[in-house]
């Protein structure tokens, strides 16, 4: 049997074949459990990244009147739709929007990205001024 560390593709093929054959005793159970747990973590990470990007672009929109270009509007729409698509594909992600730490971390990530651009001098609020539902509202563009 191929070890996961040696050849992940061969290992996965073997594990799938064992599952199909009902040979459960031969499965690499601990590794499979770990990978299943990581699958959920990866989805949460993708969602965090998507929300942080939407927030960053909304911050740019709000704080740079001259920067309210068609390109930025399109970026907001595209990133927002990516976040919504993730929510549709994995509805349980919505519970993360209610978690204060998730939302605060996404906000702080967005603010840090804006500050790293070097174009920002004004301070931002310590917490996000918009609700998750507002951020995901396709008609919302802050003034």
Where are these regions (language model features)?
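Surface/interface-facing alpha-helical segments and adjacent flexible terminal/loop regions used
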Residues: 1-143
């Amino acid at each position: 049997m191929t070890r996961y560390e040696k050849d992940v593709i061969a290992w996965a093929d073997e594990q799938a074949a064992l599952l199909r054959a009902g040979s459960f005793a031969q499965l690499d159970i601990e590794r499979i459990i770990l990978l299943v747990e990581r699958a959920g973590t990866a989805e949460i990470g993708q969602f965090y990244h998507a929300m942080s990007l939407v927030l960053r672009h909304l911050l740019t929109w709000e704080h740079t009147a001259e920067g309210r270009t068609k390109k930025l509007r399109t970026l907001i729409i595209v990133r927002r739709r990516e976040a919504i698509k993730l929510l549709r594909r994995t509805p349980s992600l919505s519970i993360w929007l209610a978690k204060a730490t998730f939302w605060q971390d996404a906000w702080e990530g967005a603010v840090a990205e804006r500050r790293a651009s070097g174009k920002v001098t004004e301070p931002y609020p310590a917490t996000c001024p918009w609700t998750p539902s507002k951020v995901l509202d396709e008609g919302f563009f802050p003034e």
